[in-house]
Each structure stands twice: as structure tokens, then as C-alpha cells.
């Protein structure tokens, strides 16, 4: 399905795909199901889902914008402390809708009712990562999923 539309008053909008990573704190707290349920309750379509351990190479690629910061080694350690759950979602304007549902990076600043506001602890232990733009989503889909692993 390439496009969805409501009626003659709405504009055709392309379906988007995005990536959500349930981070180690999410896995360790056993709240992965709660996170997925929140996405499904919004009508988001899960098109891929897999547990994986992230090696240093994939993390350096994923967090390339942070490698020069002194806290980068802490990010590496945290993201390798347990497996993560990679989730691919599809829907209309899904990148922004997911960002709205999860809340800002800093869980202490996230509103109640958002994933991070309800379940996160701080900037690092904030339960999930989500693609922030179409270009990032495209790169992350390729980084975390092989072509045959997506059901759309």
C-alpha cells in the first residue's frame, strides 16, 4: 500500500516506515510488551520485530554524531548491557506520530502519557530510540533489518 486517503477533502499522503529500538532498560524492566501495545493502540502497523545484540561497529555507525563526546563510552556500555528489540513500524506520517508518542529524549522532561514520561528514567535510560526524520528512518531500517525481514 503506497498511499492512504480519507475523502476528497484530504490530501494523499505516502505511508512511512520508521524504526523504534527498545533499549536495554526496556528489556531489563520487561516492559517491551507495554511499549508495543502503545504503538498498536495508535493503529501503527508492526512490519518487523527482532531481538538483537548490538556490537560496537553498529553502535558507532548509529551514534556517529556522538562519538566525540566524553559520554560516548557510557552509551556503548549501556547499549551493549543486554539485547535490544528492534521494531519496524509503518503508517501515515508515522515518524512524527511515534516521536509525539514517545516524548522528548530526556525522560524527566517528558509529559505523562508518553512512553518516556511514564516509563523512562533520564536521557540515556529513556526506554526507546526512534528515527527522527525520513532519512534517518531509511538508514536505520537498513542498519537493523535485512530486506526479507520486513512484512510490507
Where in this protein do the model-derived segments appear?
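Cationic, low-complexity basic patches in intrinsically disordered or flexible, solvent-exposed regions
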Residues: 2
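Non-catalytic terminal and connector segments of soluble metabolic enzymes
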Residues: 8-152
Amino acid at each position: 500500500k503506497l498511499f492512504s486517503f480519507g475523502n476528497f477533502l484530504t490530501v494523499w499522503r505516502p505511508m512511512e516506515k520508521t524504526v523504534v529500538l527498545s533499549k536495554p532498560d526496556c528489556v531489563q524492566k520487561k516492559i517491551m510488551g507495554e511499549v508495543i501495545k502503545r504503538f498498536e493502540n495508535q493503529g501503527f502497523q508492526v512490519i518487523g520485530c527482532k531481538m538483537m545484540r548490538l556490537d560496537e561497529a553498529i553502535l558507532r555507525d548509529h551514534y556517529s554524531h556522538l562519538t566525540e563526546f566524553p559520554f560516548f563510552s557510557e552509551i556503548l556500555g549501556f547499549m551493549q548491557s543486554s539485547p535490544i528489540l528492534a521494531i519496524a513500524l509503518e503508517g501515515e506520517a508515522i515518524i512524527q506520530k511515534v516521536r509525539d508518542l514517545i516524548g522528548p529524549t530526556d525522560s524527566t522532561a517528558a509529559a505523562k502519557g508518553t512512553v518516556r514520561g511514564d516509563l523512562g528514567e533520564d536521557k540515556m535510560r529513556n526506554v526507546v530510540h526512534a528515527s527522527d526524520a525520513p532519512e534517518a528512518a531509511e538508514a536505520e531500517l537498513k542498519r537493523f533489518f535485512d530486506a526479507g525481514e520486513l512484512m510490507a
